[in-house]
Amino acid sequence: MTNVPETIRKRVDSLRATLEDHNYYYYVQDDPRIPDAEYDRLFRELQKLEAEHPELATEDSPTRRVGSSAETSFEEVIHRLPMLSLDNAFSEDELRDFDRRVRDRLGADGAIEYVCEPKLDGLAVSLHYENGTLTRAATRGDGYTGEDITANIRTIPSVPLKLRGSGYPDLVEVRGEVYMPRAGFEKLNERLAEQGEKTFVNPRNAAAGSLRQKKSTVTARRPLELCAYSMAVTDESVLPETHWDSLQLVRDWGFRINPEMRKAEGVEACLDAYNELMAKRDSLPYEIDGIVFKVNRLDLQQELGFVSRAPRWAIAHKFPAQEELTIIEDVEFQVGRTGAVTPVARLKPVFVGGVTVSNATLHNMDEIRRLDVHIGDTVFIRRAGDVIPQVVKVVPEKRPAEAPMVEMPEHCPVCGSDIVQIEGEAVARCSGGLYCPAQRKEAIRHYASRKAMDIEGLGDRLIEVLVDEGMVSTVADLYRLTKFQIASLERMGDKSAANLIAAIDRSREPVLWRFLYALGIREVGEATAKGLAAHFGTLEAISAADEETLQTVPDVGPIVAGHIRSFFDQPHNQETLAALKEAGVTWQEEQVLSADEQPLNGQTWVLTGTLSGMTRDQAKEKLEQLGAKVAGSVSKKTACVVAGEAAGSKLAKAEQLGVPVLDEEGLANLLREHGIEV
């Protein structure tokens, strides 16, 4: 052994202790004490020192958590104490029977105290420590023989490589569940999908697959955690009197124990714990499939003993399954209120997640292709809480011969309009926006909104009633409504009806860009609508333009041009436009000005304060007619600030930067000078 300076030895020991402390606070206590960058700096320093002085490297060093590229053989391990499974209870009656058996066997008249632990949906493991250092880790296997996974377990940050504190026995075994949190599972699957690799069906499979990687470097990159649930020692004199206290001891040694764990006196309290945990099941950051009840006193556990392959002093009360197998009998396509066309699997009814499920979403055609779904397939269905049931995996070996593939229809199943899918988008959509009954309410809501036709008093609830009562089918029908019809509706009197009819009448002569925006063409917002109106001047010119011509308008690319062209190509939409004209809706043509003819072209203006003669939106609209871009903040590039009453920080900043300022009268004069009505 070479002579390593004592200062180096002490620094290595100090770094190891510091890093393990921070691992403990970060991964076990969820209480980070230093920034990630500082942890990384200390970690790299330890790596460097161990590389320079290999004789200082130890098996319990934090640097061992990064894993090794050497392949693991998973040698057989015989458990000194069998890792027995638990009996299950699937109903309240079965749990009551368990409690009765416990009390009868113990001859107990009163209630038994139990420890209630969430049953994590992961992989059970056994960890052996000698003199406080992790020496071996193994899977449960068949309960008597498991596999050596020591190299992979070392990579899990919440597993102590060396026990904390002092006073622990020379030999100790800690058992726990390795699991993958929901957030980590989702990120892992996203990464695997991006790399073109096979994704995991659920977090449990992901945890099991990650723990059995032949190269521990792969395991090190997987977001695994460990939660301890029991301990065993050769010298039982060091054990506390209860299971609860033994877990507190395990926690003091540096392990994470479940914060949802609690004590319960008697079976009724156990049932309360079960119901409370089931209610919050879907909000937990990890998946659980039940709750484990254990007799708390260790002497009573010993008296109760074991039967066959399970202890008499514990039982797992399982939650309703969240995944089940069933068969896809058909696939139908639904149209949402925004026109999204979604494939829905019609299933052979199956009880899952506490309810009978006969439908499940397939999301889109990309997902159907990824899963390789055929009609007649046997599939795994998953339902968690209020989440819509979904197909998560196909069992291809059970596929019937000549099972048909799922194909996207060419026409909307509701209105018959073309179904379009823009390249690069996962969602296909019905192009019959103004006409399609499935999109009716959303189309009317958008048409009446303040930034579109601004029909005051026509809110969501009234739109629901008008459509549901059959009084309105398209936006054109709004202009055929009468005061009598409106007044006859619940909670609508004569005055409200008169006000609404007046608001509808006021919307008959919109400026072109507002009408264009009101049509609800996909991805045509206010700015794009203004650009189209200014460029073409008339709705007829816009509706006749091909995609190439449409793309000459600023901010209109191939995708938006495709949406515009698709909208005007649909006969149903043209019929609705004709009906609007017939109902007396006319839109003002815009004077088409070249950039040179727009006096404020290329300038950025800012509005601040209160204007008395017009609203801020009206002022913005008039400035945009002159070619200005109206921004929300002042900078050196601002051409001018219009300051109304009670102008605040924007005015102060303009004065500080030397930006010209106009009052409301100055703005009015500017607009009149260029022929804009004030």
UniProtKB/Swiss-Prot annotation:
PROSITE patterns per record: BRCT, DNA_LIGASE_N1, DNA_LIGASE_N2
Stored InterPro entries: BRCT_dom, BRCT_dom_sf, DisA/LigA_HHH, DNA_ligase, DNA_ligase_AS, DNA_ligase_CS, DNAligase_adenylation, DNAligase_N
Active site: K119 (n6-amp-lysine intermediate)
GO biological process per UniProt: DNA repair; DNA replication
Keyword entries, A-Z: DNA damage, DNA repair, DNA replication, Ligase, Magnesium, Manganese, Metal-binding, NAD, Zinc
Designated gene of the protein: ligA
Residues the record lists as binding Zn(2+): C412, C415, C430, C436
Cofactor(s) required, per the database record: Mg(2+); Mn(2+)
Record family assignment: Belongs to the NAD-dependent DNA ligase family. LigA subfamily.
GO cellular component term, pick one: cytosol
Binding site for NAD(+): D36, A37, E38, Y39, D40, S85, L86, E117, R140, E177, K294, K318
Descriptive protein name: DNA ligase
PANTHER family registered for this protein in UniProt: CHROMOSOME TRANSMISSION FIDELITY FACTOR 18, DNA LIGASE
Catalytic activities: NAD(+) + (deoxyribonucleotide)n-3'-hydroxyl + 5'-phospho-(deoxyribonucleotide)m = (deoxyribonucleotide)n+m + AMP + beta-nicotinamide D-nucleotide
Location of the BRCT domain: 595-678
A molecular function (GO) term: metal ion binding
HAMAP family: DNA_ligase_A (MF_01588)
